[in-house]
Amino acid sequence: MAFTEIKHPLIIDKLTRMRKTETSSKDFRENLNEIAQLMVYEIFRDLKLEPVEITTPVAKTTGYTINQPVVLVPILRAGIGMLDGIQKLIPTARIAHVGLYRDETTLEIHQYFAKTTKDIDKSYVIVVDPMLATGGSACKAIDIVKQWGAKEVKFVCLVAVEPGIKRLQEQHPDVEIYAASKDEKLNEKGYIIPGLGDAGDRIFGTK
């Protein structure tokens, strides 16, 4: 399925601010949410609409309203940082959760939490995580939401690299990938270069 890099001057500017080592957790979180909000327009381009009859101050007409439920699935913990920005434009979205952690020695992904929501099989499901590095977490999370019954799934991140993109496309060819930036490479520890550092630590100020 397609990989889309959403390029826009506002996104590029805010992402540059996030990359800087000296950026505070507060500013990092704010820019993360603002970028997520800016990406919404492209991510939800094909949401289903239904006609509704309405009355304006001067006439009756036909309008259109979204008739497809949306479920956001943050990969804990860093994915939580993207929710507010998306929910500002999609306030009716329900939230499911997938908790994963990576063994820093083996780079293997382990699940520690998962909580679904109703009607996920009928919903437009967006899995969110700031980083798409090796692709292990993204693939594991999408495995889980598909086990829940999700049929229409997209993956949204800020920064992605080719190994993660390729792995996700190979394991889940039906899932569209959206990123604010395609970065250069992974280092020997599996971190994105130039990247953002550890997004979870920077969001929550834990380092």
Curated annotation (Swiss-Prot):
PANTHER family: ADENINE PHOSPHORIBOSYLTRANSFERASE, URACIL PHOSPHORIBOSYLTRANSFERASE, CHLOROPLASTIC. Keywords: Allosteric enzyme, Glycosyltransferase, GTP-binding, Magnesium, Nucleotide-binding, Transferase. Its cofactor is Mg(2+). Binds 1 Mg(2+) ion per subunit. The magnesium is bound as Mg-PRPP. 5-phospho-alpha-D-ribose 1-diphosphate binds at residues 77, 102, 129-137, 198. This is Uracil phosphoribosyltransferase. The gene is upp. Catalyzes the conversion of uracil and 5-phospho-alpha-D-ribose 1-diphosphate (PRPP) to UMP and diphosphate. It is an enzyme of class 2 (transferase). The keyword Glycoprotein does not apply. It comes from the Bacteria. Its EC number is 2.4.2.9. It catalyses: UMP + diphosphate = 5-phospho-alpha-D-ribose 1-diphosphate + uracil. Pathway: Pyrimidine metabolism; UMP biosynthesis via salvage pathway; UMP from uracil: step 1/1. Allosterically activated by GTP. InterPro entries: PRibTrfase_dom (IPR000836), PRTase-like (IPR029057), Upp_B (IPR034332), UPRTase/APRTase (IPR050054), Ura_phspho_trans (IPR005765).
